[in-house]
A protein has these predicted regions:
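Class I SAM-dependent methyltransferase SAM/SAH-binding core
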Residues: 35-39, 43-87
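A short glycine-rich, Lys/Arg-flanked "PGG" loop and its adjoining helix->strand segment in the class I
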Residues: 109-124
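A short SAM/SAH-binding and catalytic strip from SAM-dependent methyltransferases
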Residues: 95-108
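Conserved class I S-adenosyl-L-methionine
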Residues: 1-34, 45-49, 66-69, 73, 124-151
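Short alpha-helical
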Residues: 19, 45, 65, 103-106, ...
Length: 154
């Protein structure tokens, strides 16, 4: 697992990642008692906001150094060092959430299968991964998928 992240530098230079996530959290709309998995939780700021809504949230990240401040600052939350390509849980989650993390993992198919396996039937996946180059890939995939359904998205 990668461990090249610096939590101090991340907090100083990339706080916008969690500060601008209000709309994404609104889409997630966490409810009291829901089981929610936060994939690529980093230092845990958004995971904590999900927990504040009353959800039972588990934060996972592949970087032990990023999880250190999460565990220190939010000890009431369950934190796991895990690879997003290989998520295995005994019970499914009501929702999987991810903000600004998945674009760092080149094995998108493995991540998608892993996320799908973590969700209960009818569960929801709410994510933002608009890193450099991703948006064009997503647009092209949507155009192809639309064309297969007879919908012109160009």
């Amino acid at each position: 697992m990668a461990n090249a992240w610096n939590p101090d530098l991340y907090s100083k230079q990339h706080a916008f990642v969690w500060e601008a996530a209000g709309d994404l959290l609104g889409l997630l709309n966490p409810q009291p008692g829901e089981r929610i998995l936060d994939v690529g939780c980093g230092t845990g700021q958004l995971t904590a906001r999900i927990a504040e809504a009353g959800a039972q949230v588990t934060g996972v990240d592949s970087s032990a150094s990023m999880l250190e401040p999460a565990r220190r600052d939010f000890p009431q939350i369950s934190w796991l060092l895990a690879d997003a390509r290989k998520l295995h849980f005994p019970d499914p989650f009501d929702a999987v959430f991810s903000n600004a993390a998945l674009h760092w993992i080149p094995e998108a198919r493995q991540v998608a299968e892993s996320v799908a396996g973590a969700l209960r039937g009818g569960g929801r996946f709410v994510a933002e991964f608009g890193g450099h180059g991703n948006v064009e890939t997503i647009v092209q995939a949507a155009i192809v998928a639309g064309a297969r359904q007879g919908v012109n998205l160009q």
